[in-house]
UniProtKB/Swiss-Prot annotation:
Record-annotated site: Transition state stabilizer: H179, R240
List of residues binding substrate: R90
Name the record gives this protein: Acetate kinase
InterPro entries reported in the protein's UniProt record: Ac/propionate_kinase (IPR004372), Aliphatic_acid_kin_short-chain (IPR000890), Aliphatic_acid_kinase_CS (IPR023865), ATPase_NBD (IPR043129)
Catalyses which reaction(s): acetate + ATP = acetyl phosphate + ADP
Gene encoding the protein: ackA
Residues in the signal sequence: none
GO molecular function ontology, one term from the record: magnesium ion binding
Domain of life of the organism encoding this protein: Bacteria
Length: 403
């Protein structure tokens, strides 16, 4: 048996799971919050519903990793560090260089560092997390699992922007797409649930959380996705605007006196359903306000759902049909209201969903279509950490790869 750590390092957080491979048994799941503060919070769940948490000063990610590994031994989850065979790290961006996960060496670290301009908020903490584990577990293989890798199969007609071609060749300006690890997991799982080879399926994956993206997956390969050069492109999100007329940036600079960076900050952090509703970036709050008659909340829900509705139609056309629509992530898995708004009116393309199955369906695998529906509709809770663990085993040749 092989124990793998799946890690997602944020600017002030460290999420992790410890999995036994190849059985894929979850041994522990944890979160360190407020890294860099005197009152950092460490929480871990393990065993049969057991939980441990502590508030303690943690000034660096290295200290957070040290505490994590110490607690794994203290709580008898592992007996020694030697039991950890590999560490898989979620990394935001792999550009065109990485179409698959990769064992991390000095060259890979330099390359990831060079991607910082494309992910200034995410890449530095990704690197910090890697360095912290390398320092404490120097002989354990570390694997980078890129959010963008799954979308490297997109054809040119879907990843190129209609800009001078040299912007692509000289500066790498193109659609990259994100949430690839999630889209990969749910589409593979959909094939298992449908009992059909992934190679034969045309799937539309809707990853709907505070960040949100749709992917068209044909034959197990991403052929199009809504996020672009950055995660700002695409559908309306919690605080991100999604796609809009780029001429708005100089217009708003002129009208508001803001810099380009300030306007982009508004589009990333003050827009989306938060900016539209003036209430919250959390769709649960907006659903409640809409139910109470708040007009801006209702319009926000309509815009959010309508954009997704439109992309489903576009991607069905691109793939010459669709076999299943998948809902995943916080909103996709848990909001029957949003799912209903998105699915309503898709009967013309063979989507017949059952309101009695949709209503109240939360956080569990479930088909919510009528049996006769040509297009299946499936809720699949995402499991990015499992993909990270599988890739770590496969790429580092730790045990026979997961089938």
């Amino acid at each position: 048996m092989t124990k793998i750590m799946a890690v997602n390092a944020g600017s002030s957080s460290l999420k992790f799971q410890l999995l036994e491979m190849p059985t894929e048994e979850l041994l522990a799941v944890g979160l360190v919050e407020r890294v860099g503060k005197e009152d950092a919070i460490f929480t871990i769940k393990y065993g049969e519903g057991q939980k441990f948490n502590v508030v303690t000063p943690l000034h660096t990610h290295k200290e957070a990793v040290e505490l994590t590994l110490e607690k794994l031994i203290e709580l008898d989850i592992i007996q020694s560090f030697d039991e950890i065979s590999g560490v898989g790290h979620r990394v935001l961006h792999g550009k065109e260089l990485y179409a698959d996960s990769v064992v991390i060496d000095d060259e890979v670290m330099k390359n990831i560092e060079s991607f910082t301009e494309l992910g200034p908020l995410h890449i530095p903490p990704n690197l910090t997390g890697i360095r912290a584990f390398q320092a404490i577990l120097p002989n354990v293989p570390q694997v980078a699992v890129f959010d963008t890798a799954f979308h490297q199969s997109m054809p040119e007609e879907n990843f190129l922007y209609s800009l001078p071609y040299e912007y692509y060749t000289e500066h790498g300006v193109r659609k990259y797409g994100f949430h690839g690890t999630s889209h990969k997991y749910v589409t593979q799982r959909a094939a298992e649930l449908l009992g059909r080879p992934l190679e034969d399926l045309r799937l539309i994956s809707c990853h709907l959380g505070s960040g949100a993206s749709i992917a068209a997956v044909a034959g197990g390969r991403s052929i199009d996705t809504t996020m672009g050069f950055t995660p700002l492109e695409g559908i309306t999100m919690g605080t991100r605007s999604g796609s809009l007329d780029p001429a708005l940036i100089p217009f708003l600079m002129q009208k508001t006196g803001k810099s380009a960076e300030d306007v982009l900050n508004v589009m990333n952090k003050e827009s989306g359903v938060y900016g539209l509703s003036g209430i919250s970036s959390d769709l649960r709050d907006i659903e409640q306000a809409a139910a109470e008659g708040n007009h801006r909340a209702e319009v926000s829900l309509k815009i959010f759902s309508n954009r997704i509705h439109g992309y489903i139609g576009q991607y069905a056309a691109e793939m010459n049909g669709v076999d299943a629509i998948i809902f995943t992530a916080g909103v996709g898995e848990n909001s029957d209201v949003i799912r209903e708004r998105i699915l309503r009116g898709l009967e013309f393309m063979g989507v017949y969903w059952d309101p009695s199955l949709n209503n109240g369906a939360r956080g569990k695998e479930l088909f919510i279509n009528y049996p006769h529906s040509p297009v299946k509709v499936i809720i699949i809770p995402t499991n990015e950490e499992l993909v990270i663990a599988r890739d770590t085993v496969r790429i580092a040749n730790l045990v026979e790869a997961h089938a």
